[in-house]
Structures are given as C-alpha cells and as structure tokens.
Regions:
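Conserved small-domain helix->loop->beta segment predominantly found in fold-type I
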Residues: 68-151, 169-187
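Residue-level detector of conserved catalytic or cofactor/ligand-binding positions
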Residues: 189-200
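Short, glycine-/Ser/Thr-/acidic-enriched flexible segments
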Residues: 13-14, 28-31, 57, 116-118, ...
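Amphipathic alpha-helix from the class-I
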Residues: 54-68, 152, 156
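Charge-rich, low-aromatic oligomerization/scaffolding segments with amphipathic character
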Residues: 156-166
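Solvent-exposed alpha-helices and their adjacent loops that cap or buttress functional pockets
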Residues: 2, 14-18, 62, 103-105, ...
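Active-site PLP attachment segment
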Residues: 2-35, 43-52
Length: 200
C-alpha cells in the first residue's frame, strides 16, 4: 500500500487482459459509489462485457499465480538489463538509480534504455525497432526507449529485443558528439495572433 487514494492499473499492459482494459483502484478513504457516479456521467453505462470478462480472467490469474508470474517478469527484465548493458553504448536503467531522495523506487518491469551513447535518439531506435525488426515497444523520446515487460513475454522475446538492439548499434550508430545537447526542442513557430482573435 503506497498510500494513494486512487490508482489506475493498465491491466492490458501488465496483467494480460485485452487492449483498452484497465482497473481503477480506490483506497479506503474514497467513496467508490461516488466515483462510480462520476464515471457514469462521462462514460457509457453500457460497458464492454468482452473487456470486463478479460479483466476478470486476468484478475483471477494474478490472484492465483501473480507472485510467480511477476517473479519471472522481474528475472527476465534483469536479464535484459544485463545483456543490453553488455552491448555497450546503451544504458539500461536499474535499481542502482534509487537514492532515497530524487529516486525513491524503481519498477523493474519497465525496461528503460538510454540510447544517446550510440548516437541515436530514443525515437530513432523506437522507429527502427518497429519498422525494421517488427518489435513494438512502449515509447521513444529524445534520449531513451521504454519497453514494458509483462506476464505475456517469454525469454525468446527478450533475446529478440536484445539482438535487435545490438543490430541497431552495429548498423545505424553515429557519433554521439554530433547530437543536440538539449532535452527540449524550442518551437520554431511564431504565432502572430492568439487563436481566439484569428479570423477564419
């Protein structure tokens, strides 16, 4: 219990339910009937029984085998981190970042990898993995990629990802010194008139 009043859990990412299904968990200090009323005001009252059934099956599976399943997920993620760091040029973030101050804890199921060491932005590696290797990961930004390891993954999937990252480094790496050294890209668009005053 982390003390949150409410938390959303993407069961379709972590628990094996169908895409678009997630759970909203409420703590003991939250009136769940009131939350349900608010949700019914903004969403359909005719929920998808297919999605709800998949959530229930996933919930049952996690209740019966969740600890064992996530132990395997954690082992696969740690294996992936070690293998990716052995490639060189990449850095797979790990529990070594936890310092009790700015980083309190670390979710081992999220495989976050720094890519600028091979001279490529995370979004470039993301695109290469998707387009050239048929591997869809969670996201890529200016410096990192994020892959989500879940109970549906197998060790073969991890090895395929590690092999693809080694291949990307071998075939597409550039000189990291040539990369922009900023976290944010400034907007090049100048808006001459606020939208509310613009005439159509």
């Amino acid at each position: 219990d982390a003390g949150a009043d409410m938390a959303s859990v993407s069961m379709h990412k972590s628990g094996g339910s169908l895409t678009q299904s997630s759970l909203l968990l409420t703590g003991k200090n939250v009136n769940w009937e009131y939350v349900s009323q608010i949700i019914n005001l903004t969403q359909t009252t005719s929920a998808s029984y297919l999605l709800m059934s998949s959530l229930d099956i996933s919930r049952r599976n996690l209740a019966l085998r969740g600890r064992e399943s996530f132990r395997k997920v954690a082992e696969m993620a740690e294996y992936a981190r070690a293998e990716i760091n052995d490639i060189g040029g990449y850095y797979a973030y790990g529990k070594d970042m936890v310092n009790g101050g700015s980083v309190y804890d670390f979710d081992v199921t999220k495989l976050s990898v720094y890519t600028r060491g091979i001279g490529l932005a995370g979004i470039e590696v993301y695109d290469l993995l998707r387009d050239e290797y048929d591997i869809q990961i969670e996201l890529g930004d200016i410096a990192n990629i994020l892959a989500y390891i879940s109970i549906g993954d197998r060790i073969q999937d991890i090895e395929r990802l590690v092999g693809a990252l080694a291949d990307v480094k071998r075939l597409y790496s550039k000189d990291p010194a040539q990369m922009l050294n900023t976290e944010y890209i400034l907007s090049l668009i100048h808006i001459s008139e606020p939208t509310r005053h613009a005439q159509i």
